[in-house]
Amino acid sequence: MTLCVFALIASEFLPVSLLTPMARDLRVSEGLIGYGMAISGAFAVVASLCIAPFSGSMNRKVLLLALTALMGVSGAVVALAQNYETYMIGRALIGVVVGGFWSMSAAVAMRLVPPEDVAKAMAIFNSGNALATVIAAPLGSYLGGVIGWRGAFFCLVPVAAVALVWQWVTLPAMQPEKGAPSFRIFFSLFKRSAVSFGMLAVGVFFMGQFVLFTYVRPYLETVTQVDLPTLSTILLVMGIAGFIGTSLIGLFLKSSVRLVLSVIPLSMASIAIALVLTGSSVVAAFLLLGLWGLVATAAPVGWWLWLARTLPADAEAGGGLMVATIQLSIALGSTLGGLLFDGSGYRVTFFTSAALLVIAAGLALAATRGNPAEPAL
């Protein structure tokens, strides 16, 4: 499943490094190609909310295999696209896979490992995410230069095929433990204060993260004034740090999920403020953004573990709700960050990110209040 996550994240973000040649070949603007990211996010939201009610009593192994096959189909559709409309269909398909796969990830982890190992399992799943974040953009750019952007997307097809066979051989049959939930369950979940605070915390956290993260490159280019090789190195450091953080976070989650979920956004808020205060320092940018990657990339592991513990009987529905919340918050955060960055500059943008992250920390404390397994904070 980690291989599937790697291929999935690589598929989702591959257009970022191939915008120019894709726009040229499909005879549209780079901005229109960029909308392929937006449509995948929109379909991820829809799929995440629909997958549990619509999948009914289907064997979850079969469902995962179908989603993996659809990922390969998406790569082929984009690679063979002769017009913009076909490209967007391919991007919509990968959105369905993103929403469906991630909404089931916590429930699947709970079925595959004992309760004490769920944090480790989620960390392993997310390591595929972190690894793809490190290499997807530079690898896509390299492959695009060697075999063209169509060849780069076609490379995802055999990777999806390998993941499909691997999952078919290794995953056990996983029948739903109870009947398929209806859409009413999403409203009933919000009646639980822990769920309401938790989803609000997740939403504000990802908004705060992407208010800043989306505009790291223009910040480095215009404020820190780094050249292209240095910029690429900083982004690579962020990715590597994220992989390390994802690999290590399970050790801290064993001690206290509550502490991790509150300290991470507070740390990121401090980093956002420090970036404003040390804007012209390249060394500071390396260190601070490396720390940002270390904690930010690992944070979802903590939230997925919180979900598994808070909604053990409704993990699929809760997972769908969380994926929808995350996708919407990323879109809102990126949009808000763009408005602030263009209208008020990087200082206001980064301070807004810090404020949202502090609020997210408080909401995380509220979401984890009353758990006897957690130390009081």
Regions found by a protein language model. Give the residues of each.
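Helix-to-loop junctions at the C-terminal end of transmembrane segments
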Residues: 47-59, 245-257, 341
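Helix-loop-helix hairpin linking two adjacent transmembrane segments in secondary transporters
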Residues: 84-86, 115-117, 123-169
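C-terminal transmembrane helical hairpin of 12-TM major facilitator-type secondary transporters
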Residues: 259-303
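A late C-terminal transmembrane helix in Major Facilitator Superfamily
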Residues: 310-346, 352-353
